[in-house]
Every structure is written in structure tokens, then in C-alpha cells.
Amino acid sequence: MKKLINKTIILSLFVALTGCNDWLDVSPKADRKAEDLFGTEAGFRDALVGVYALMCGTNSYGRDLTYGYLDVLAQYYNSPLKTTSSGYEHNFKNAAEYKYTEKTEESRISSIWSNHFSAVANINQAMLFIDENKGVFTSPEVHDVYKGEFLALRAFLHFDILRLFAPSAAMNNNKGLDALAIPYVDVFTNIAQ
């Protein structure tokens, strides 16, 4: 009988404690609402650091857009493209052979594109709040520095996407100047397209 009472008490406590809304409404520490994040100068700094962290990834300037993928496309490396006796082929074999429709290359190109636009989306999110929350900065000059850095990074990322993905202006007797190139995104939307 005592065991039954103990089990009933434990079960009742479990149900009472897990049924509480505060226990169920838990968000990760790294996941913050935009209003909370951009309510302090430190939040804007965190957002800026987050953009730089995206830019340091291996599918961005941490490898592919510095010494990796682009250098292979430019044929800076004279790597053996054939399989060696150990079965090794280098990571950029398909890129060196201009096989862009291979799954690995499509994935690499897609990750470069999406990583850049993810950074642009983070910048645009910060730009929604930067003038509205001008008072959280220690001085107007600090506000201007943050805003300028966000704007410069957005322009830089768009230019790099243009450089990588737009048709050459010199193509087809300079008709490339009139060709559609890339989307210029200056407003944050949370809608998948």
C-alpha cells in the first residue's frame, strides 16, 4: 500500500510540474527575439559578430571564396585530377573539370549563395531596428558606425554575389549589361520563396 501511495505522489508531482506553461515554453539560449536582441548595443554587436561568423564559414571566406573553390576555378592549382593508387581524389575535382551539374558542385554553389543571403538577411533584420533603437547606443557616433558597417557589409555581400553569379557584362557584345543578374535584398522577410 505504501508503494502505491509513493507512486501516486510521484506521478502527481510529475504531471503537475510538466503541465506548467513555463516549463513548456523554453527557447534555446542562442535563440533570442529580435526585439530583445536589438534592445541593447550589445545585441547589435552580437548581430554584427554573427554576420562575420557566417562570412568565416568554409563555404564562404573561410575557404571556398579565398583559397579554395575560386582558386580551383581560376586554375591556380595544378592538382592531379586522376585517382591515385590510394583512391584519393581532391575535394574540388569536379570544379577543376568545370562539372557544375554534379551533386557536389551544385551543393557547394548553393551553399555559397544561401550563406551570403543568410548574412544579408541578418543585416536586414538589424537594419529594421537600428534607427528605431538609436537611444541604446552610447553615442550617436557609435550608432553611425554600426549602421555604416551593416550597410557596407550588405553592399559588399551583394557585390560578391553579383561577381560570382551574374553574367559577364562583356558577354554577347555587351548585352550582359542589360541582363538580369541577382536579387538585391534590402528588406528582411521571413517568407520562404
Please provide the spans of the model-predicted regions.
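Terminal processing/anchoring signals of secreted or surface-associated proteins
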Residues: 1, 20-22, 51, 123, ...
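Conserved, well-structured interaction surfaces
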Residues: 89-165
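Membrane-proximal, proline-rich intrinsically disordered regions
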Residues: 20-71
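A structural signal for short, hydrophobic/glycine-enriched beta-strand patches
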Residues: 29, 57, 69-100, 187-189
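Secretory-pathway/luminal and periplasmic proteins that interact with or process carbohydrate-rich
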Residues: 56-61, 76, 157-170
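Short coil/linker segments at helix-helix boundaries
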Residues: 165-193
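Bacterial Sec-dependent N-terminal signal peptides
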Residues: 1-29
